[in-house]
Amino acid sequence: MHKFLALGLLPYLLGLLNSTRLTFIGNDESDTAIALTQIVRGLQQSSLAILALPSLALSDGVCQKERNVYLDDFLQRLHRSNYKSVVFSQTELFFQHIEENLQGANECISLILDEPNQLLNSLHDRHLGHRLSLFIFYWGARWPPSSRVIRFREPLRVVVVTRPRKKAFRIYYNQARPCSDSQLQLVNWYDGDNLGLQRIPLLPTALSVYANFKGRTFRVPVFHSPPWFWVTYCNNSFEEDEEFNSLDSIEKRKVRVTGGRDHRLLMLLSKHMNFRFKYIEAPGRTQGSMRSEDGKDSNDSFTGGIGLLQSGQADFFLGDVGLSWERRKAIEFSFFTLADSGAFATHAPRRLNEALAIMRPFKQDIWPHLILTIIFSGPIFYGIIALPYIWRRRWANSDVEHLGELYIHMTYLKEITPRLLKLKPRTVLSAHQMPHQLFQKCIWFTLRLFLKQSCNELHNGYRAKFLTIVYWIAATYVLADVYSAQLTSQFARPAREPPINTLQRLQAAMIHDGYRLYVEKESSSLEMLENGTELFRQLYALMRQQVINDPQGFFIDSVEAGIKLIAEGGEDKAVLGGRETLFFNVQQYGSNNFQLSQKLYTRYSAVAVQIGCPFLGSLNNVLMQLFESGILDKMTAAEYAKQYQEVEATRIYKGSVQAKNSEAYSRTESYDSTVISPLNLRMLQGAFIALGVGSLAAGVILLLEIVFIKLDQARLWMLCSRLQWIRYDRKV
């Protein structure tokens, strides 16, 4: 029995040995060159990189010479077909050439004239496996290498060319099936005695291969992030240990997803593309961030779900995964699933003090102009009335001079004096005299007119009447009506403080009012703060200054936790995140209690995949169809509507229960603050305060008048006493 078993295994072992060594047939150099030329032309590319190493397997000088001969012939035929080629004899230069093409997003085809097991590890270590790079291995073997010996793992694209007989070549491809085992499959062949290549193009396209995954199972990291994923964690699923990133440890930590927009999207994709998925818990329950600047080029430079993708332990990653330059170096993104914008949420603007409502109908910059207008209206009115009296005065030579009780007639003096007297002209008043205390009357008249008090006509002149009409129109239609309408509006709907809806206002609030800004840990919003410029950099510096003792003090586990923090009374707190995520979480606690800022910057969310993912094109096609048909927007709106219905049902239930106890009054009061409320005595506090201030000012002025009158009487008595003493001294 053992003899027959050994004889059965002998052909298999001989096949393995035969597949790993070079086998050349004499005088077949032109056949090999022709076949390789046809194979390369079947790829329909215009350039080719060739790696021809002085392999140790070619110890025989004849074999080495024969390979050089067919290589030269192959290059000549390739150049005749207008192909560009570059030949490398050193692996380092060859790898650098591949890296430069990948950095420029250029498709690169390489022909390696050596066995794959010598270069496979280097290709994986240097992350050269990509859907844009194709490696063609030909070393003259009759059979392809066994999957037990060599495994070509995704995303590495490999073509193995074998030569089972003379003028016959077989082409094996590792991505001919959508499964993840990457086994070599026969996809084409070349027959020199027939028509050459069996089919053109040489390889099946990735769109056709990965249009149907045929039940392939993908691992998807997930964590609780409404409205994208609603996750329920199992017992002790979040335990930090050193081996958390191992695949066995990750699969042991089970989670249960109960809903979410991206959960629905993933179910739709799995149904359309025929694959299955398995949720695993993302390390740290975060999207992931860069560990340090020193290890950014390593294979595990990111944490969280992005770190699982980078290390190849996961296939997809959804859940508002924002695009950024730092993340793009570690993973790739599909067509965007959400066009969003950055924003921050704070508490709703608080109601202002109702006692000062009488000052709010006009803005602060209007009150100075209004007060100056009222102050200068009196002097202007006085000038309009007094100018005619001033104009009617005339200069004339008076014949009679008054010197106390004496009357001097200038005509008589001219007659009795030999010399001529120089007479000075004097002002002669008109018959109509200026009213007594006209200036004070004008001041009080304008004040009573602007304050809508009853007042008599001050002057009969047409100029004064015209100005009185102008003042009355300004006081009635401009000031009184506008002020009354605004004040009525303020009483009907009490005013609130200015909202904090811009970065400038948020920065001022953090500096002057002690506001604290929170952000989800290891999120794209945190990367925007860390790597941003101008205001974002200043805000990040303020955040770090406010929590000097606790460097992680401004981190929150999720946006939902930040909104809950504000809802519980955090009136001096703000949360930065995606606007859609903020809006959804705000709906849970009542949109009237929060204030969303303006759109700060544009951000896109997409499905994250591994670098060089071979099925990214197929995934993009499906996502673009969903986006163009509006299905993505409908899914988002449906998730919002579902959550809104749940919130309304919860609110109605709580209202019916709390209406029977003492807390119903506080609920009603908080609700009444958002709608039009009737006038109450609290709103009229400002009028009584103004009355009290006016009464106090009047009392102070009266007291000052009494004091100054007494001082004037004392000074007059002292002056009279001095005059009496002076007269007495003169008489003596």
From Swiss-Prot:
Its main location: membrane. The keyword Hydrolase does not apply. It holds the Pfam family Lig_chan. One of its GO terms (molecular function) is ligand-gated monoatomic ion channel activity. One of its GO terms (cellular component) is plasma membrane. Residues 1-19 form the signal peptide. Disruption phenotype: Response of sacculus neurons to changes in humidity is abolished and consequently larvae fail to move towards their preferred humidity. Glycans are attached at residues 18, 235, 299, 531. It is found in: Cell membrane. In the antenna, detected in sacculus neurons which innervate the first and second chambers (at protein level). Keywords: Behavior, Cell membrane, Glycoprotein, Ion channel, Ion transport, Ligand-gated ion channel, Membrane, Receptor, Sensory transduction, Signal, Transmembrane, Transmembrane helix, Transport. The chain crosses the membrane at residues 370-390, 466-486, 689-709. Residues 20-369, 487-688 are extracellular. GO terms for biological process: detection of chemical stimulus involved in sensory perception. Residues 391-465, 710-732 are cytoplasmic. The keyword Ion transport applies. It is a multi-pass membrane protein. It comes from the Eukaryota. SUPFAM superfamilies: Periplasmic binding protein-like II (SSF53850). Integral part of a neural sensory system in the antenna that provides the neural basis for the response to environmental changes in humidity (hygrosensation). Together with Ir25a and Ir93a, mediates the response of the hygrosensory sacculus neurons to changes in relative humidity and is required for dry detection behavior. Belongs to the glutamate-gated ion channel (TC 1.A.10.1) family. This is Ionotropic receptor 40a. The gene is Ir40a.
